[in-house]
Curated annotation (Swiss-Prot):
This protein is one of the two subunits of integration host factor, a specific DNA-binding protein that functions in genetic recombination as well as in transcriptional and translational control. One of its GO terms (molecular function) is structural constituent of chromatin. It comes from Rhodospirillum centenum (strain ATCC 51521 / SW). This is Integration host factor subunit beta. The gene is ihfB. PANTHER family: DNA-BINDING PROTEIN HU, INTEGRATION HOST FACTOR SUBUNIT BETA. Gene3D superfamilies: IHF-like DNA-binding proteins. CDD domains: IHF_B. Heterodimer of an alpha and a beta chain. The lineage of its organism: Bacteria, Pseudomonadati, Pseudomonadota, Alphaproteobacteria, Rhodospirillales. Belongs to the bacterial histone-like protein family.
């Protein structure tokens, strides 16, 4: 599901809301999650999961084309851990 499909689906399920308003809401939610992660905060949505940032240390890597050793700088990556309710819903028969 893409962001556009999510917006359309939410607008269909909530006919009292205009699609442009739903788009603003979804965009604001994504922006707030992104801003929190950029600050190093953890975003927990109970039952759904938690977003956090993990640090990858600098390391030596290898260019697969040339085999040359290269330095890979440290970086921060987003991480998502599913919540218990989401896992249970996905694994029901």
């Amino acid at each position: 599901m893409t962001k556009s499909e999510l917006i359309l689906r939410l607008a269909e399920r909530n006919p009292h809301l205009y699609q442009r308003d739903v788009e603003k809401i979804v965009t604001t939610i994504f922006d707030e999650i992104t801003d929190a992660l950029a600050r190093g905060d953890r975003v927990e949505l109970r039952g759904f999961g938690a977003f956090s940032v993990k640090k990858r240390d600098a390391r030596l890597g290898r260019n697969p084309r040339t085999g040359e050793t290269v330095d890979v700088n440290q970086k921060f990556i987003p991480f998502f851990k599913t919540g218990k309710q989401l896992r249970e819903r996905l694994n029901t028969d």
